[in-house]
C-alpha cells in the first residue's frame, strides 16, 4: 500500500492507494469519528460496491443517497436532495459522509459536507480514474450552474482518500481514457520525466497492468498533493492544475453537461492551449506534436466541437474563475514539463486558433 500525506496543518489527511481498499474497513473506520454514516453514490456504482461496503461497516448506523449518474446531475437540485436526506433522518454534526463514486459524486458530496450544519466530515472513495488522480484530492467541491461549471462550491478538505485500484476494472473504457487526460496533464504542466514515462508505458496502461496503474496514480496524487500543500486556495501555483480547463469548461457548458466527458473536454483544451502557445511562439512544433500524439493515443478528442468558434468560447471564458480584473487568464505549456499563467493573450490570437 502507498500512503501519501497532504500537508495542510490541522487539515492534513492521508491518501491511501492499494488494491482491495474498499474491503479494508478497519482502516476506513479509523477515520469515522462517530456512529452515523451516510454514503452518497450513484445508480451505476451502487450495484457494484454499495452493499459490500455497508456490510463491512457493521459498527456504524449507515444510510445512503443514490443519485442518477452523470455530469448533468451535479446540480443544486441534487445537492438539496442530499441535504434534505440528512435533515429528514436527523443527522448531526458528528455524521460522516462517504463519497463513493467518480468526480461528480465526490464534488457534490464534498459540497454538501461543507454546507450541512456549517461543516461535517467526509471521506473520498473515488472509483473512476479521473477522480482518483485529480478531483478527490485537494478539497475543491462544487456543483454546476447552467451558466458555468463548478460555479457554486467551496474549498473543503476530506478526512481521508481511499483509492482502490480494483475499481478501475469495472470502469468503461471511455471513462478510463477520459481520466488519462488528467494524468497526461501532470506531465505537460510540470514533469517532463513523467511525460516520458507515459510515452513509454502506453501499452501497459491500456492493458490495465496493476503495478503500472498504481505507480501512475501515486505519481499524480503526489504531484497534486505537493501543489495543493503550497497553494490550497489557488492564489498562485495551483492554477497551473487548470491546464486545458479554460477551453474545456467552455466546451462542457456550451455542449451541455455530460455530452462531453470532463476528461475529453480537458484533452481538447490542452491541445488548444498548446496551439495558443505555438501561436505565441512559446512552444516548439515538435513538442506540440508529442503532446497531441500522447493525447490521441488514448482515443481522446483533439479538436473543438464543430459548432463552437471564437464567439461561443469567449462567452463562457468571460465567466472563468481564474480571471482577475476582467482579464482572461490561460495556462499555457511552454515546453513539455513547463507551463505558465498568461493574461496577455490577444483576441486576435484566440480567433486564430479557434
Swiss-Prot record:
It is found in: Cytoplasm. Keywords: Amino-acid biosynthesis, Aromatic amino acid biosynthesis, Cobalt, Cytoplasm, Lyase, Metal-binding, NAD, Nucleotide-binding, Zinc. Pathway: Metabolic intermediate biosynthesis; chorismate biosynthesis; chorismate from D-erythrose 4-phosphate and phosphoenolpyruvate: step 2/7. It catalyses: 7-phospho-2-dehydro-3-deoxy-D-arabino-heptonate = 3-dehydroquinate + phosphate. The keyword Zinc applies. Its main location: cytoplasm. This is 3-dehydroquinate synthase. It comes from Colwellia psychrerythraea (strain 34H / ATCC BAA-681). One of its GO terms (molecular function) is nucleotide binding. GO terms for cellular component: cytoplasm. Its EC number is 4.2.3.4. Catalyzes the conversion of 3-deoxy-D-arabino-heptulosonate 7-phosphate (DAHP) to dehydroquinate (DHQ). One of its GO terms (biological process) is amino acid biosynthetic process. Pfam families: DHQ_synthase, DHQS_C. Belongs to the sugar phosphate cyclases superfamily. Dehydroquinate synthase family. InterPro entries: Dehydroquinate_synthase (IPR050071), DHQ_synth_AroB (IPR016037), DHQ_synth_fam (IPR030963), DHQS/DOIS_N (IPR030960), DHQS_C (IPR056179). Binds 1 divalent metal cation per subunit. Can use either Co(2+) or Zn(2+). Zn(2+) binds at residues 182, 245, 262. PANTHER family: 3-DEHYDROQUINATE SYNTHASE, 3-DEHYDROQUINATE SYNTHASE, CHLOROPLASTIC. Its cofactor is Co(2+); Zn(2+); NAD(+). NAD(+) binds at residues 69-74, 103-107, 127-128, 140, 149. It comes from the Bacteria.
Amino acid at each position: 500500500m502507498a500512503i501519501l500525506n497532504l500537508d495542510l496543518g490541522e487539515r492534513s489527511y492521508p491518501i491511501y492507494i492499494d488494491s482491495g481498499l474498499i474491503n479494508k474497513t478497519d482502516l476506513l473506520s479509523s477515520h469515522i469519528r462517530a456512529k452515523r454514516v451516510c454514503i452518497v453514490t450513484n445508480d451505476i456504482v451502487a450495484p457494484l460496491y454499495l452493499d459490500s461496503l455497508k456490510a463491512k461497516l457493521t459498527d456504524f448506523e449507515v444510510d445512503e443517497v443514490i443519485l442518477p449518474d452523470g455530469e448533468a446531475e451535479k446540480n443544486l437540485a441534487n445537492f438539496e436532495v442530499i441535504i434534505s436526506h440528512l435533515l429528514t433522518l436527523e443527522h448531526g454534526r458528528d455524521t460522516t459522509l462517504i463519497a463513493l463514486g467518480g468526480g461528480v459524486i465526490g464534488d457534490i458530496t464534498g459540497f454538501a459536507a461543507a454546507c450541512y450544519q456549517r461543516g461535517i466530515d467526509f471521506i473520498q472513495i473515488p472509483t473512476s480514474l479521473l477522480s482518483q488522480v485529480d478531483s478527490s484530492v485537494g478539497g475543491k467541491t462544487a456543483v454546476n450552474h447552467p451558466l458555468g461549471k463548478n460555479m457554486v462550491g467551496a474549498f473543503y478538505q476530506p478526512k481521508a482518500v481511499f483509492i482502490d485500484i480494483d475499481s478501475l476494472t469495472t470502469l468503461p473504457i471511455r471513462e478510463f481514457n477520459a481520466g488519462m487526460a488528467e494524468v497526461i496533464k501532470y506531465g505537460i504542466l510540470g514533469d517532463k520525466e513523467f511525460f516520458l514515462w507515459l510515452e513509454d508505458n502506453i501499452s501497459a496502461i491500456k492493458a490495465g497492468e496493476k503495478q503500472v496503474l498504481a505507480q501512475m496514480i501515486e505519481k499524480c496524487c503526489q504531484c497534486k498533493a505537493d501543489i495543493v500543500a503550497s497553494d490550497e486556495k489557488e492564489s498562485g501555483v495551483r492554477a497551473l492544475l487548470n491546464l486545458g480547463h479554460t477551453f474545456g469548461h467552455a466546451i462542457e457548458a456550451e455542449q451541455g453537461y455530460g455530452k462531453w466527458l470532463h476528461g475529453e473536454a480537458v484533452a481538447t483544451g490542452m491541445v488548444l492551449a498548446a496551439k495558443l502557445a505555438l501561436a505565441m511562439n512559446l512552444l516548439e512544433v515538435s513538442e506540440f506534436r508529442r503532446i497531441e500524439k500522447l493525447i490521441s493515443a488514448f482515443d481522446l478528442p483533439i479538436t473543438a466541437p464543430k459548432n463552437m468558434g471564437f464567439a461561443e468560447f469567449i462567452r463562457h471564458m468571460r465567466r472563468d474563475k481564474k480571471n482577475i480584473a476582467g482579464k482572461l487568464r490561460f495556462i499555457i505549456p511552454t515546453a513539455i514539463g513547463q507551463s505558465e499563467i498568461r493574461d496577455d493573450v490577444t483576441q486576435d490570437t484566440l480567433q486564430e486558433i479557434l
